[in-house]
Amino acid sequence: MKNSTLLPALFIGVAMALGLGSLEGSAVQGILPYIAGGLSTSSDHALWTLTYFIVHWSLGITLMPWSTARFGARRVFQGAAAIAATGTLVSALTHNLWIMLLSRAMEGIGAGLLVPLSQSLFLRHSPTARHGMVTMLWSNAMLIPFFVGPAIGGWLATTLNFRFIFWLSLPLWGLAWFLGRTGIPAGGENRDNPPFDLLGFGLLYAGLMALQVTLDQGEQYGWWHSFYILHTALAALILLLLFAWRESRAPHPLLQFHFLRQRNYWLGLLLLCLGWSLFMGWAAELPLWAEETLGFNGYWGGVLLLPIGLAAVPVSTLMDRLQGLFGLRRLATLCFLLFAAAYGSGYFSPQSGLAEIFWPMLLLGLGLGMLFVPLTMIILSGIPAEDIPKAATTSNFIRVFSANIGVSLISVYAIRDGALASNAFREHLLAYGNSSAMTAPTLAGLVAAQANTLSIDNLLRLSMWLCLLAALMAYAFLIPPRAIVTPGSPRSYVEEAEEEVAPL
């Protein structure tokens, strides 16, 4: 293990970089109208600054195993921090949407490299007996910015300018780069490393970008009524199928899909993606709805998400103890029951305030605090220790990209359902007449507010039923890790962690 005097620099620098990557993704969630104004575009197009960050965040994850083996952990960390900092600088300077999307892609690539790299460094430079605690610290470093980022971004956007999100991040990236360079040991380069799967990466990149265009622009062009969207969707399908075929035959693939043959891996990953994508989708949609319908500014729209962090952080710190008391499968089930309770208890009106939104968000935070540790350990259960980095890279890629699907689909559903409700209200007014003394613009505003809120409530009910189904699947079909351990099987981090917290 590395000299213990340099470990604080390693942990602080790596955690700071990981948190900054998450912060730059989350800080824009509640200020899309402000970004739209700064870039002279619409809020729908401003949403691309979030979705393009996420898609490149997931792509960055696939680069980490090969680049670390080829260049060493320290050089990869420095490169990732430098790429993200460069993107941050361009984001702070540009007034053009397309240049902003390019800079957000750079930020996403850098942040994506840091996700599996930071997890690997944390586990490699800590005792085995502390792996459970280190995993909790790693997940908090990644998640806490998602809770506080929207409020920070909202405050900066309303008091200064949304570009200060990027200006203030720049010196922190520099500090993280310096601490990481000081704490991460040099070496680890392997010039005989197998060649990078450039063809596979090209197919994956092109496929994900075609899928992203379909998700982002489908509503604008009328979905399947548009040949443009049909062609981009077909291109995405063909390219991603070619990528899967390529990975199954490549001697050194980017992603290892054969792990999906294990029940705990694919089912645990499916549940993790569902919980994470729903959270990310609502974290983007609720602040936007509050600003456009309730009249909140960017700061108060971001404050809506703070109760999630108030509950999630304390619960996540107790996961070492809770998994020993209840077991991983029961915790995963309870997580989705809490999600269902949060989405089911959220019933809003155009007159709702923070008090009505606080308790559903608090319940959501309780569930989110239980999401990562039990499902991550279930996903990795039964996998030999030497294969865990490959399995974790594949699962992290799929989980991160699932957030993009959640953000896009929840946004599209809210828009479409709101439009349907608005049309129904207008037809009712035309049929029965307007007996009030309201002017036409005032009445139109009330109809839009009611329709948008009804759409949010319907989507909350749908999310509740999805989480209830997920809870049933978790309890009925996940296999507790202890049940699949066989005598003489290769030891893994999951087995060790299970033994450490086993109740007396």
Residue locations for each model-derived region?
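Flexible interhelical linker loops that connect adjacent transmembrane helices
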Residues: 2, 129, 177-205, 220-225, ...
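12-transmembrane solute porter fold
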Residues: 7-23, 28-32, 41-52, 58-65, ...
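Interfacial loop-to-helix junctions that mark the boundaries of transmembrane helices
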Residues: 44-48, 98-102, 106, 159-167, ...
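Helix-loop-helix hairpins in multi-pass membrane proteins, especially solute transporters
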Residues: 61-199
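Membrane-interface helix caps of multi-pass small-molecule transporters
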Residues: 66, 70-71, 93, 151, ...
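Short helix-capping/hinge motifs at transmembrane helix termini and TM-loop junctions
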Residues: 94-95, 127, 183-186, 215, ...
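C-terminal membrane-cytosol helix-exit motif in multi-pass small-molecule transporters
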Residues: 170-189, 205-217, 235-249, 470-481
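Hydrophobic transmembrane architecture of multi-pass small-molecule transporters
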Residues: 395-504
